[in-house]
Each structure stands twice: as C-alpha cells, then as structure tokens.
C-alpha cells in the first residue's frame, strides 16, 4: 500500500476510531459492528431495543454506515479493513466536499444524540452515554470532557461539539481539543 498523505496524527486518530467501531474485534468493520455500537449507545440512553427511539438511532447510524461503506469498502465484501479505512481517508484528504458529504452528517447525528434534553448543550452526563459505547472509564470520560470544554462552563454548546468532531477528522494540530472527542486517541 502506498504511503498515506494523511499526517501521522490523523492516521493515529483514524486507527483509534477504527478500533472503536470494530466492536467485535474481528479486524474489520461491518454492519454487525455498527449494530453493536448502536446497541451500546442505546443502552447508554436507556432506549429499549423495541422502542421507536432505538429504531431511529439505528436508522441514523446504518444510513451513515451505508454511505461510508459504499465509498470505503474497496473490494465490496461488505467489510471494511483498516487498510481500506485509511486508504479512503487518504484519498479524500484534500477533497473539499468531504466535510459536507461525510463529516457534517456525522456531526449532526452525534450532536442530536448527545443533546438529551434538546437545549443545544451537551453536559457531562450526556457525554457519558457516548462514553459507554466508546468503552471509556469514568476517569477518562471526565478527562475527555474537560479537554473539550474549552471555556470551562460545564457544557459543550452544539457548535463546540460540532467543531470538536470536525477537528477529530480534519485537524493536524496535536493540540486541537477535538482530537479527544472519541477518547484518548493515543491508546
């Protein structure tokens, strides 16, 4: 595989996210992994699996998965390997439509999921729900939230959370707070 034009930092963050999404630790991400991830998110929100809320959550994540996997799954085996994952992000590193077409929908889904009470603010208690799916320890949850809460007001405004997600995927700045959105990417 040719060298990536992605920075070492972005490769590190993307490998970390790949490991998170490979919920069953098969070395590949497939629809089963996404469904397991959704189940963990739903459990964090106390959504019963037969609820409308669970169905909506699953629908949103499966939609993102279907869109991404069509682009990422190079050999069309309905599984995404780490090499395919990195090759995709490497190919779109300079694509100005990538943010609009792929990152923005992820931002909207994540922010709406985390904003439990609909006030356009994400609190530590809200972030803990995501942290359960990310398998973060309670200490990590507080550490990560504190890093992202730049103005130290105890909440992430919708814009702060969206900016953090964007930074996770697009920033080459080692000090960008969004690098931590999904946890300690250095693991």
Q: Model-found features: residue ranges?
A:
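Plant-biased recognition of short, low-complexity, intrinsically disordered N-terminal tails
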Residues: 1-15
